[in-house]
Amino acid sequence: MEKITVPFITGDGVGAEVTPSMQAVVNAAVKKSYGDRRGIEWKEVLAGERAFHETGSWLPDETMEAFCTYKVGIKGPLTTPVGRGIRSLNVALRQTLDLYVCQRPVRWYKGIVSPLKEPQKVDMYVFRENTEDIYAGIEWEAGTPEAEKFYRFLHDDMGVTKVRFPETSSFGVKPVSREGTERLVRAACQYALEHHMPSVTLVHKGNIMKFTEGGFKKWGYELAEREFGKELAEGRLVIKDCIADAFLQNTLLIPEEYSVIATLNLNGDYVSDQLAAMVGGIGIAPGANINYKTGHAIFEATHGTAPNIAGKDIVNPCSIILSAVMMLEYLGWKEAASLIENALEQSFTEARATADLARFMPGGVSLSTSAFTREIVRRIENGNNE
C-alpha cells in the first residue's frame, strides 16, 4: 500500500470546522479512487493561537520540522495578532521553507452565481511571488530610533529629499531580485507549457516603480526568451505584460485573454482576491505555496479565521477542500482530485451549498458545514451519480 504522511495545521477560528471537513472529503475520495492501494496518514502539528496556549510558541520548531520532513502539508487559517510585534505566521511559513510560489487557480464552477455575465470565460492560474516585495516585512515604525536612523541614511548618504513628513513617517523596504523573479517566471512558463495554457502575463507597476516592478518585467522577459525561446518561436507559448491597474480592469472585460499570471507579492494579493470574487468569492478560492526546487509545498485555506462565525456550523469549507484538490494533483493522485471537484460542482448545480453561496442561487438550499460535508462525501461514495 502506498501511504503518505501529510502534516496539517487545523487552524484558528473556523479552522476547527473546515479542516475536519476537508479530511473527511479527501479520505472518501482516496478510498473510492484507490481502495486499499493508497492512503493518507494525517499528522497534526500546531501553529497559531492553540500552539501559543499549549506550547508558548506561535510557530513551534516541531511544526517546521514536520513540514521539512514530509514536504507536503496543508493548513487552515491562522491568527496573527495585529500590532503586537508578532510576525504573520503565514509569511513565516512561506519564508522559512522558501515557498517562493503562491499558486491560486481561478475557475468558475457551474451553479455558482457570479457577478459576471460570462463567468465560464474565467480560467486563470496566478503565480504570485511569495518571499519578496513589501511583504518581506522590512519596516520601521514612525518615531522609533530605527525609523530615524533609516531616514538619516536616506537623506544624508543617499541624497533623498522627497520624504514629505520625515518626523512622522514609517518606512518600509521593497526588495525585488533577479533571482526571485526568474524562478517565479520559470515556474509559470513551465506550468503553462505542461498544462497547454497559451500565455504567461507579467503583471506589474513598472511604469511607477521602475527598478523594482520594472525590474520584474525586464528580468521576466529575459528569462522567458533565454530559457523558453524555442517554445516562444514556435508559438507554443506567448509572454506578455500588463500594468496592474489595467489588468484588474481587463479581467472584468476580457478575462479570456489571460491564462497564467506571474506577478509580485502585493499585486498578487490584490489580483488573486479580485479574481476569486469574479467566480464566487474567497470561500471557494484555493491556494498553495510551493518551492519547485525542493518539492516543499503547503496548501491552505485562503480566507481568514472568521471568529464571528466560528463554532456555528455555517462556514464554507470549500476553500480548503479545493486546496486539498490541488494537493492531490500535486501528489499525482488525479483520480481522487477529480472525484472531489465533480462532487462539488454537482452539488452547486443542484443549488445545494453553504449559506454564503446558496443565498444567491435560484432555489438555493442552505446547508450547514457538517451537512454539506456529508453531502459531498455521499456523492463521492456514490460515484457522483446521485
Residue spans of the language-model regions?
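Glycine-rich phosphate-binding loop
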Residues: 64-81, 223, 227-296, 380
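Flexible, glycine/charged-enriched surface loops at secondary-structure junctions
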Residues: 35-41, 195-204, 228-241, 333-341, ...
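N-terminal beta-loop-helix "entrance" segment that forms/cooperates
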Residues: 34-60
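Glycine-rich phosphate/nucleotide-binding loop
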Residues: 49-52, 250-352
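Buried hydrophobic positions in well-ordered alpha/beta secondary-structure cores of metabolic enzymes
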Residues: 12-15, 71, 127, 188, ...
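Phosphate-binding loop/pocket of nucleotide- and phosphate-handling active sites
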Residues: 365-386
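Glycine-rich phosphate/diphosphate-binding loop of Rossmann-like nucleotide-binding domains
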Residues: 7-24, 33, 149, 153-242
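N-terminal glycine-rich phosphate/adenylate-binding segment common to multiple enzyme folds
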Residues: 51-157, 170-171, 266-270
